[in-house]
């Protein structure tokens, strides 16, 4: 019982205790629903509930709690005109800003790194138990929490004064435009018409 009281006191020492509570609840809720999955009448209802909770946590962490607790914000730019895939906003850009509370930072980063690790362990257990449909749910959860963690990690290590530090170590491939596919189709139809 002392652990619960100490944890409660730690959250109260946060600069945003309500926001911190929602952040931690957003990480714990999908895990709790997964563990209590036997209470659901069907796996489909459980799957949809967990994916919706994960999506809400992804949005809340990325746009609200990350911005307020550690003063970081990131987004992925999928436009073909941009050479940089990630765009970052950080407290490092602004000289006179409020300091980051160490309790906020510690709880934020622990929850960000611990959540994908827990989902990964649950994924290994699902594979060992040969529950492949359950593994799909866990893979979605691991990808969503891991992608958010990766974005915040890159944002935290980003240096606004160094333009080369914006390149993440993992680059998603760019999808070519449809004009290349139409050129290929015209080229192929040229040879088909010549053969006839």
From Swiss-Prot:
Pfam families in the record: DUF846 (PF05832)
Residues carrying sugar: 63, 161, 180
Annotated compartments: Golgi apparatus membrane
InterPro entries: TVP23-like
Entry annotated with the keyword Transmembrane helix: yes
Membrane topology according to the record: Multi-pass membrane protein
Any one Gene Ontology BP term: vesicle-mediated transport
UniProt keywords, alphabetically: Glycoprotein, Golgi apparatus, Membrane, Transmembrane, Transmembrane helix
Domain of life: Eukaryota
Entry keyword annotation includes Membrane: yes
Cellular compartments per GO CC: Golgi membrane
Transmembrane segment boundaries: 18-36, 43-60, 107-127, 132-152
Cited function: Golgi membrane protein involved in vesicular trafficking.
Similarity comment: family membership: Belongs to the TVP23 family.
Protein known as: Golgi apparatus membrane protein TVP23
Lineage: Eukaryota, Fungi, Dikarya, Ascomycota, Saccharomycotina
């Amino acid at each position: 019982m002392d652990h619960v009281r100490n944890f409660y006191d730690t959250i109260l020492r946060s600069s945003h205790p309500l926001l911190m509570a929602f952040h931690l609840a957003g990480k714990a809720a999908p895990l709790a629903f997964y563990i209590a999955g036997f209470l659901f009448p069907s796996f489909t209802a459980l799957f949809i509930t967990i994916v919706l909770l994960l999506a809400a946590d992804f949005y809340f962490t990325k746009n609200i709690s990350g911005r307020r607790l550690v003063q970081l914000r990131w987004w992925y730019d999928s436009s073909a005109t941009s050479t940089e895939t990630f765009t970052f906003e950080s407290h490092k850009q602004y000289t006179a800003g409020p300091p980051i509370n160490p309790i906020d930072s510690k709880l934020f980063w622990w929850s960000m790194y611990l959540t994908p690790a827990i989902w990964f362990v649950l994924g290994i257990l699902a594979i060992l138990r040969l529950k492949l449909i359950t593994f799909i749910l866990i893979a979605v959860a691991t990808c969503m929490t891991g992608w958010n963690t990766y974005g915040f990690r890159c944002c935290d290590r980003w240096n606004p004064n160094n333009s080369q530090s914006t390149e993440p170590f993992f680059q998603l491939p760019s999808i070519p435009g449809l004009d290349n596919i139409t050129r290929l189709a015209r080229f192929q139809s040229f040879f088909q018409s010549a053969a006839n």
